[in-house]
Amino acid sequence: DRVIYDRIRAGRPVLGVCVGEQIMFEHGLEHGAHAAGIGLIGGSVNLLDADVVPHMGWDTIEAAPDSVLLNGVENERFYFVHSYAAMEVKPADTSRFDIDLSDSPERVSWCSYGRSRFVTAYEHGPLSVTQFHPEKSGDAGSQLLKNWIATL
């Protein structure tokens, strides 16, 4: 986690995918056990509320209107394979890591599955994460990765 904090503090882009998104939150609950996350995003990760878990396959998303990652692919489908997700974003106290992102807007994109509406992409300063797998999401995923690379 120190390497991630150092990169964010220096303004160097970080991309987390799937579990890479989940660990950025403050904490999570999996199989009844609480685990601390890195804490760069406020909130927790929990089991999806759906009749069938995991959420596996192609799905549409609700892209944040000003998303940098999802620019040009707002109406596309992305590939998911996960059982846990964050259902909300809360303010995170990143000052304890000597990180101040207060000048950067938070961009939150969403997806719905079963009875859950969850964070599917989050962008805040140099931090970008996705719950879906861009590397498995065809042309839309390739464009997302190109968008992220352009931030380097």
Regions found by a protein language model. Name each.
Residues D1-G57:
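Cysteine-nucleophile active-site neighborhood
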